[in-house]
UniProtKB/Swiss-Prot annotation:
Family to which the UniProt record says this protein belongs: Belongs to the Lgt family.
Lineage of the species this protein comes from: Bacteria, Pseudomonadati, Pseudomonadota, Alphaproteobacteria, Rhodospirillales
The entry's keywords: Cell inner membrane, Cell membrane, Membrane, Transferase, Transmembrane, Transmembrane helix
Compartments, record wording: Cell inner membrane
Cellular component aspect of the GO annotation: plasma membrane
Primary enzyme class: transferase
UniProt GO BP: lipoprotein biosynthetic process
Pathway: Protein modification; lipoprotein biosynthesis (diacylglyceryl transfer)
Positions annotated to bind a 1,2-diacyl-sn-glycero-3-phospho-(1'-sn-glycerol): R141
Keyword DNA damage: no
The protein's Enzyme Commission number: 2.5.1.145
Organism in which the protein naturally occurs: Azospirillum brasilense
Pfam families: LGT (PF01790)
Top-rank taxon: Bacteria
Protein name: Phosphatidylglycerol--prolipoprotein diacylglyceryl transferase
Length: 268
């Protein structure tokens, strides 16, 4: 049985007196800061609106949307019976439990409200947010690996399999967090970084966002074949996981966005 020793990385990055700073929190911070800076750089490369100042002002909205939506999404999608019995636990974000799909819904809501107040096109504004999103996904999945959570399915014959300390079975498993970091983070970021600079893509509002939806959805569906499903849910309809079921509408919505964008002439 093959396995790589899990790197003994303390989930706590450092402590400042009574304040404990975890790698997971730093991953969120890195994702927001670097994603924000990337949006500013993209916005400054093209005159007009949405402008860099618009993305500057949106940062707080994005943070609230991701955290609030991510937590509500986890409660609704992944552990609703538990939280119905323990409603106050839903407020205890520090106990863990965030959903990407919930965070996405939260950000979409924030974009719609922000753009309505500013008189901006949600599609054009969302395109640059979509181009930056893989940065946060990359760091978030690395933090999942450091925490030894959301690990993969048993893989006794895979030479790079890892035995995770939090696994009750203590068997070699796919490091699915790293697979997701690579697909949803690195690969998707590079793809979007190339496309968002192409006039035929950048000039069609909604095109970049649509490609992000398709790219993330497909990446997540693939990665879920290697990831252990949540214990309280297991496998659902036709052997699919919750992550896969939530990603299918993402892909379909992305295809629709791209189709609609292709019908519009590029604003070059």
């Amino acid at each position: 049985m093959l396995a790589i020793a899990f790197p003994g990385i303390d989930p706590v990055a450092f402590e400042l007196g009574p304040i404990v700073i975890r790698w997971y929190a730093l991953a969120y911070l890195a994702g927001f800061v670097l994603g924000w800076r990337y949006c500013l750089a993209l916005a400054r490369s093209t005159p007009g609106r949405p402008s860099a100042e618009d993305y500057d002002d949106f940062l707080t909205w994005a943070v609230v949307g991701v955290i609030l939506g991510g937590r509500i999404g986890y409660v609704l999608f992944y552990n609703l019976p538990f939280y119905l019995q323990n409603p106050l636990d839903a407020l205890m974000v520090w106990h863990g439990g965030m959903s990407f799909h919930g965070g996405l819904i939260g950000v979409l809501g924030a974009i719609l409200l922000f753009c309505w107040k500013r008189g901006l096109s949600p599609l054009a504004f969302g395109d640059l947010i979509a181009a930056a999103a893989p940065i946060g996904l990359f760091f978030g999945r690395i933090a999942n690996f450091i925490n030894g959570e959301l690990y993969g399915r048993p893989a006794p014959d895979v030479s790079w399999a890892v035995v995770f300390p939090r696994d009750p079975l203590q068997v070699p498993r796919h490091p699915s967090q790293l697979y997701e970091s690579f697909l949803e983070g690195a690969v998707l970021f590079v793809l979007l970084a190339i496309l968002v600079r192409m006039p035929a893509v950048r000039g069609r509002a909604g095109m970049t966002a649509g490609i992000f939806f398709i790219g993330y959805g497909l990446s997540r569906i693939i990665a879920e074949f290697f990831r252990e499903p949540d214990a309280q849910l297991g496998f659902l309809y036709a052997g699919a996981t919750m992550g896969q079921l939530l990603s299918v509408p993402m892909v379909l919505f992305g295809v629709w966005l791209v189709a609609q964008a292709r019908r519009r002439p590029a604003a070059i």
